[in-house]
Amino acid sequence: MKDTYESPLNSRYASDRMKYIFSPDFKFRTWRRLWIALAESEKELGLNITDEQIAELKAHKDDINYDVAAAREKEVRHDVMSHVYAYGVQCPNAKPIIHLGATSCYVGDNTDVIIMREAMLLIRKELVNLLNVLAKFAVEYKDMPCLAFTHFQPAQPTTVGKRAALWLNEFLMDFQNLEFQLSQLKLLGSKGTTGTQASFMELFDNNTDKVKALDKMIAEKMGFDSCFAVSGQTYSRKLDYQMLTVLCGIAMSATKFSNDIRLLQHMKEIEEPFEKHQIGSSAMAYKRNPMRSERIASLSRYIIADIQNTAMTSGAQWFERTLDDSANKRLSVPEAFLAADAVLDLCINVADGLVVYPKMIEKHLLEELPFMATENIMMEAVKRGGDRQELHEKIRVHSMDAGRVVKVEGGKNDLLDRIAADSALGVTREELEGIMKPENFVGRAPQQTQEFVDNEIQPILDKYSDLLGLDVEIKV
């Protein structure tokens, strides 16, 4: 059916892997895992819950009766209680102890944390694969001189690989932030309606040790080290913001990467992959548009804007909780992850298929190199007895005249011919050609690139070698 809206993130951009993490199946199966963890922990701490009841809960943890839950929600207008009811229909013996002592946020918020963790683990996998692809490209082209740009004006040469190392460094910073945020991630735990654990104190006859143990046991059963020490009814919505700082950072890095590729493609130096039957324009048949890089920039802009939702939502929470977070959070958090997933898959695809045109790179570099070589030329002339100030003025005049030929007349850069013809400078054309070797102007760019990959990137690739080899698919 095509008669209703569907999110492009779902239909066009995000991977099936990420879409599953934010699917109803993953969400409601996690609810049931949390109810099982709660019941098991309460039993282990002495409540009257039987092995048979827990076995019944486990037997139906994955076969969710959505129709029963949906019908119940129409009646009671409460999603959690509707699923408690539906689970109880399948588990009549365990029905009395489902959700015992808990509030809605026990399943809602803990599940949100679990979903974000799973989604962030996938983001980490994608990011590691991107680091790997970009590192290979950087090392392969670390020695190839190219024109650098500041203010998008020609500047001191760098190398193709060193420029890629700049992209790599941006994504490395995102990886480091991701690792930190994952290391700090905690569950809400079992905190009750206002975060005081009052209902659990009642259940356990005011036994503080058991109530504290309940939190820890649930965390461990769900694969976490700990729960938040204090909270209201919900975990602090600042957590959503902190997680999205990782995605926003990735979007910032991807924007720079994709914009650089778009500019390089305009100059015909480097292109993103272009499929054999791909069409660039419906009117201009010759066009090879950088549509993947443009999509990266477009989706990244969405993520950068989306993080404002989590910032405003966090600040707007009243006292122990308010519900104006809910609708916004249901949109902003999943869509940020879906968009970041799409961005990273696109970045991997583009970086892995970059097409380099060495002759065009050399052409552009040699067109500008005479201007950049003037200081070296002047130093050579000074060593032969010339006056630095007089030489500077002569080279300045020659540079202005050569620039005029290029810009006004559309001619070739004849600066070297002018310098060679000036007897006051005393440098021959052959000597100028020796000075004009591009590799003499790139400084430590090749060494910087290799050292950066060896010292900063390779340890990550070694640590997470089991994550490499991700197969990404670009749908359109």
Where are these regions (language model features)?
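A helix-coil-helix interface module used to build multimeric assemblies
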Residues: M1-A198, N206-A219, G280-S281, M291-R295, ...
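Short beta-alpha connecting loops at secondary-structure transitions
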Residues: K19-S23, V68-A70, Q278-S298, E320-E335, ...
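Amphipathic alpha-helices that form helix-helix packing interfaces
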Residues: L38-S41, I123, L127-L130, L134-F137, ...
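Glycine-rich cofactor-pocket loops
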Residues: V139-G161, E271-K287, E320-A327, D352-M372
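Short, well-ordered beta-strand elements within core beta-sheets of diverse protein domains
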Residues: K162, Y241-G249, N376-R384
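Glycine-rich anion/phosphate-binding loop at the beta-strand->alpha-helix junction
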Residues: D174, D225, G232-S326, R330
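Active/binding-pocket-proximal capping segment
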Residues: E271, K394-D401
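Long, amphipathic alpha-helical stalk/connector segments used for oligomerization, subunit docking
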Residues: Y302-R388, K394
